[in-house]
Amino acid sequence: MNEVNDFDAIRISLASPDQIRSWSYGEVTKPETINYRTLKPERDGLFCERIFGPIKDFECACGKYKRIRYKGIICDKCGVEIARAKVRRERMGHIELACPVGHIWFTRGIPSRVGLLLNLSTRSLERIIYYSHFIITGVNDEAREKAIKDLEVISSQRVADKGSEVDTRVAQMEAEDATVEAINQVRRDFSTEREQMEEDIQLLIDQLKDLQIGNLLTENQYYELKQRFSNVFEASMGAEALLKLLSYIDMDKERSKLIQETRSTSGQRRKKAGKQLQLVEAFRRSSNKPEWMIMTVLPVLPPDLRPMVQLDGGRFATSDLNDLYRRVINRNNRLQHLMEIGAPEIIIRNEKRMLQEAVDSLIDNGRRGKSVAVNGDHKAKSLSDLLRGKQGRFRQNLLGKRVDYSGRSVIVVGPSLKLSQCGLPRRMALELFKPFVMHRLVRDGLAPNIKSARRLVERARPEVYDILEEVVKERPVMLNRAPTLHRLSIQAFEPVLIDGSALRLHPLVCSAFNADFDGDQMAVHVPLSKAAVKEARETMLSIHNMMLPSSGEPVVSPSLDMVFGCYYLTTTRPGAKGEGKIFSDFEEAKHYYEMGIIDLRAIIKVRDGKGNMLETTTGRIIFNDVLPKEVEFQNMDIPKSAIKKIIGRCYKILSSQDMAVMLDKIKQLGFKYATSSGISIAMSDISVPREKAKLVAAADERTAISEGQFARGLITEDERYNSIIETWMETTDRITDAIQAGFDKQGSVYMMANSGAKGNISQIRQMAGLRGLMTNPSGRIIDFPIKSSLREGLTTLEYFISTHGARKGLADTALRTSGSGYLTRRLIDVTQDVIILQEDCGTSNGTWIVEPKEKGMLPPLVDRVLGRWAAHNVVHPQTGEIIVGNNEEIDEAKAKAIGEAGITEVFVRSPLTCEATHGMCRRCYGRDLGRVRLVDMNTAVGIIAAQSIGEPGTQLTLRTFHTGGVVGVDITTGLPRVEELFEARPPKVQSIISEIDGEAEVIENENGRHIRIFSDEVYQDEYELPSGWKTQVQSGQWVDSGMVLASPEMEGKSKAVVQSDQNVVARVAGEVSVDGSLITIKYSESEEREYAIPAAMQIKVKTGDSVRAGQQLTDGSINPQDILSILGRDAVQKYLVEEVQKVYYSQGVHINDKHIEVIARQMLIKVRIDSSGDTDLVPGELVDKFRYEDINAKVLAEGGEPATAHTVLMGITRASLSTESWLAAASFQETTRVLTDAAIYGKVDKLSGLKENVIIGKLIPAQCKSCKEATVERAERIAAAAAAPAVSTLPENCL
């Protein structure tokens, strides 16, 4: 049995008129849709049953044939074929156009493909298509030559005739004794007239010579020339003229001409010729013909894809396409009629233009001129509108589909659940698992057939719930919380049936879903096939997803009450009951606590299992009981950070199941002891420190001094502002110290903040001390502090100031969410085809990871190299011992050893330098951080990278910092900075960088500030003389280029010389030194660059400083394009990785470098061809780097000249649109432009990425091992079941 999806690639191309007719089941000739009385489709109309198929299954229009037994028969009465009604979704019709019509995608696109091919501007093309100008379509050279000769003959004849007439007149005047002056006047008049006649004739000859195919003529010019030279040229208007011209083009000749032009011209002309050459090559390589861009036949969409629905009250709702088709048919029919009756040319021309406009509106409404509206002011949705945008076919129906077997409900906490479980309401489960329950009822004999089983389920009999309990044990369910920002937003759980209507969620998975219980909703999905169930169990179960794929940190760490409970359990209370008692072992201590003899937090002495005496508490003993034996006794307070570390450690030594058990035990301990702690918070717990009044008064005094100095003009506005800010920041810190010093260490507020359960010292300072300095909406600190605390209450002005900045925070959050979502979408698109497809690409290249100079700006070296593969040996600097061998993984122990050895740079394999031609290899990627092992084959690492960068996007700030006081420079940070880098845009404040190595000189004068960089490098050029040669120069002598340095002493000596057959001549000018037979010329090459520095910029170098190429000369951010052009590919990749990392790390978000590297790789994967050599590549063409290298390797192997190219840095949007897959690009943005290009090039989508496979409904290529096995199983089962009849109504392959 062949599946519909059994193919490997999809090709898109232009459709020829014959192809359109072959798709069609008949011509639509009438604009009618359905008859409003009979409600049946009109014959030959837009819904005709004869063309598109019957409305009712196996029933013709007239009712003569009914039932399936007549399948395939065509009714002799009404002409309808007996078939299923669903053929009306597949069968197309066509309209034979009365005149050719331009396809708006090809005529109006940017650039216009038709215009580029015919060398016409968009404006000229529009004038032709819309019948305002004529274009010459043919010139008869013989007729032209004859016409020119005829004109010359006429000219000379006229001159001769006029001359003889003048001679006669002069003779007559002489006979009449006319004056000499009068006779001369007649001759002068003749001379002027002759010149005028020759000019007029020459003008006509020039006009004739200028007649070239493709020239435009206005209406007046056309009729004037046509009247005189009707046999010399042909010209016409509209799309038929373009059709004729396009059909004349000889692609091979055109190619040769354009290749010559690209080599012989430069600048704008060369660029245009390059574009034209690419287009010509596209037509040559594909089987498309350029005339197919002009339509003579219009396909009609199947009627069920543009339906008409009857509403209440007898009115009809119809798709806009029907109105647009109706306009086309009406105008086409009218044009045919006018042509048949021989209407005047002007009327026919007008009708042709209207037909062109109607077809334009049908294909892409609103692209040209005013858009066609239906029902008042509603813009009609054309065919293009159905494809593009969020509501278009690609994004709405192909990439995002509604899913069967799913439900949705509010979530509540399930503290008693295991980590792998979720609570599923019984009613919901019964609906979701209905087919399975019905199947089991029939199988167990509780119902005779499916129908009665359905009745039993609907009545919810007790035996139904018993079977439901069994059924839910067989398969997990998947829970999803929107927004689905990363893979942990969808996880699988074993369902536990519960009463009520809300889903119950395990408290430890909340952080993965970013869920809380304030009304959040979640969706439930049931995996149906065996493969889906297996994958859900083996990879999606929550116990297999405990680590963040972005950083490798634990994601199932306890929080809030659980953290507080564990902290409370492990803290000590001085003077507690039983303090100082000594016990023989842990069990005895616990026994005494249970009997109430000692307090939970009393400090006691106990012998551990090894016989050592420990000073600890019963609480710590209880906490350590839940930890594995491999973890040493944790004898300390356990705040949130400590719990995270313990979990991270345990993950490496325990299996997923054991880890889940341990986490559940920690959860239970936390909840139990948080409850027994009796934690509460009251106003009295927050006490204002005594020192506050004194500190605030001192700060007011200092502020008053600064204000006074400013008023007297002793300090500037900037200095005043900075002084006030500094004063209050210092005061705030002192008050914070006072609050901390006065804290009750056993108090609930301190314990909450210190444990990491909730709140921090900054919030306590605002409640007890003072709120301090606030920012205004632009992010600038307001130099008026809030001196009150929340405990004391704020004044009206203070309240206003605090809300002023806070409102910006709320607006930021709303904007951040959409901005971050769009960034994630672009990142996903650019990396969706990056999949692990190779074990090892075998490269020896890599990237240097260096210990950051500034701590806190970037992660430390040890964290960055963990999980990477070394690209060469990492050697201990002192002992010379190899810590990590070449091509070995750097695990925790080796990373620690690198840190201890004081190594500051390590050369590692990287996605940036991976040489896998498709996807990526396992060694270059390294460890899968979410699974803590080497990445598996077929893992979609591109998607993981995009999610890891996009998911924390909402946490980034959205502001532009305003540095300094009044006059400062805006520095872009946070999300806008990340976007700026990934889109490879010039930064908002662009730093000036040096293009050369050299010495700096800072110049300040009345013309402003400049930095001059000059380099004076000294080089040597050496000449080795053969024996018997004589030098012609002396040491210390200055020589010019081309001067003779040495010559043979006598004839017949060796002539193996450098540049001349006879003498050795200097290649460069410089100072000579002679040493025996070696002549050396010392010469220097000086280079200089000067940069103008804007007034607001701060200079980073001083006169005399040594400067490297690519070094920043001023503050601001560097343009990545400059780094690429000056320092090359590796430098720009490193810059992008470090700059993005700085933004995230400064906000406390940890992302592994490799995710950013995957994106950077995609941004630099294309090269632009400079010269084509002996390849088929076209100058200016963008080509994949690996394809370019392959083509060059083949050409070199055949002894040809390779192409040359330079690396291009593309922003993620451009990189997404220039992907090899046209399906992925079309579903991203600019759908019509992508499809236009893909059709012309006849592009083949090899379906290597994820998006294209989702679009066509195939399994994505990123399959886990279990899925692959299941795919094979499924194919075998389909083959076996092909002959067997269907048994029940169960979903496919779910048994």
Swiss-Prot record:
GO cellular component: DNA-directed RNA polymerase complex
Enzyme Commission identifier(s): 2.7.7.6
Pfam families for this protein: RNA_pol_Rpb1_1, RNA_pol_Rpb1_2, RNA_pol_Rpb1_3, RNA_pol_Rpb1_4, RNA_pol_Rpb1_5
Entry binding sites for Zn(2+) 2: 841, 914, 921, 924
CDD domains xref list: RNAP_beta'_C, RNAP_beta'_N
Keywords: DNA-directed RNA polymerase, Magnesium, Metal-binding, Nucleotidyltransferase, Transcription, Transferase, Zinc
A molecular-function term among this protein's GO annotations: zinc ion binding
Cofactor binding summary note: Binds 1 Mg(2+) ion per subunit. Binds 2 Zn(2+) ions per subunit.
Needed co-factor(s): Mg(2+); Zn(2+)
The keyword Transcription is assigned to this record: yes
SMART domains: RPOLA_N
Catalytic activity: RNA(n) + a ribonucleoside 5'-triphosphate = RNA(n+1) + diphosphate
Annotated Mg(2+) binding sites: 516, 518, 520
GO biological process, one term: DNA-templated transcription
Ligand binding (Zn(2+) 1): 60, 62, 75, 78
Similarity comment: Belongs to the RNA polymerase beta' chain family.
Subunit: The RNAP catalytic core consists of 2 alpha, 1 beta, 1 beta' and 1 omega subunit. When a sigma factor is associated with the core the holoenzyme is formed, which can initiate transcription.
Described purpose of this protein according to its UniProt entry: DNA-dependent RNA polymerase catalyzes the transcription of DNA into RNA using the four ribonucleoside triphosphates as substrates.
HAMAP family reported for this sequence: RNApol_bact_RpoC
Name by which UniProt lists this protein: DNA-directed RNA polymerase subunit beta'
Organism: Dehalococcoides mccartyi (strain ATCC BAA-2266 / KCTC 15142 / 195)
Higher taxonomy: Bacteria, Bacillati, Chloroflexota, Dehalococcoidia, Dehalococcoidales
